[in-house]
Amino acid sequence: VEPVHINYRGYDVWEMPPNGHGITALMALNILKGFDFDGRDSVATLHKQIEAMKLAFADGMQYIADPRYMRTKVEAMLSEEYAAERRALIGEQALLPEAGKPFCGGTVYLCTADNEGNMVSFIQSNYKDFGSGVVLPGYGINFNDRGAGFSLDESSDDFLLPRKKPYHTIIPGFLTKDGEAVGPFGVMGAYMQPQGHVQVLMNTIDFLLNPQAALDAPRWQWIDGREVWLEDRFAPEVIEQLRKLGHDVRV
């Protein structure tokens, strides 16, 4: 497939296209690049990151489908004009966007590189538990159950049809700058993946952390509505101030 990308502060961020949800990470970054940030774990930074991710997911859950059936085009979703429109919605209080309810997954991500400059960003998941439970006779290959990503709402671009690809969450990423490879990136966890991409990339680009530190930094995850999960490594005062901004924070 042909990956989709945006430019974020001089870096080209590459993600898997629809029917995967890598585009939600790109939409969030497109919104966030219009802000200045005062620190990695500050209340203002976390609030803006969470709100941008919520807006991106609201669009993603509405529009992502098999690209042959998408009535809203990727180019429109990633346009600077649309990012500015969505950015203007972010205020001092937590939003309540319309979006589907995320749920947990079981995914493996790995990346590798060699001394010749070859790099691989790889992810694998059968989706729920053991996937479909259907195994290829004689080979032991277990088929996935990604068909669960279809919508049964006939008005949805992601409505279930024969020979159609469902919305899915498998999105290995890649980062380049000025046409040169910087490196692969990715995280695990279904709907956490684009949220993790945004946080790891901002840790690297905005806050100048090395790759290990960018991955090790504490993370948040938007769940649904105003509910946000934060790792307990965030400062207690940051957690309390986010609650005052209207976020339903669970630690």
Question: Where on the chain are the PLM-derived regions?
Answer:
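Glycine-rich phosphate/pyrophosphate-binding beta-alpha loops
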Residues: 14-22, 108-111, 123-134, 187-193
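Internal maturation/activation junctions in enzymes
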Residues: 35-126, 138-139, 146
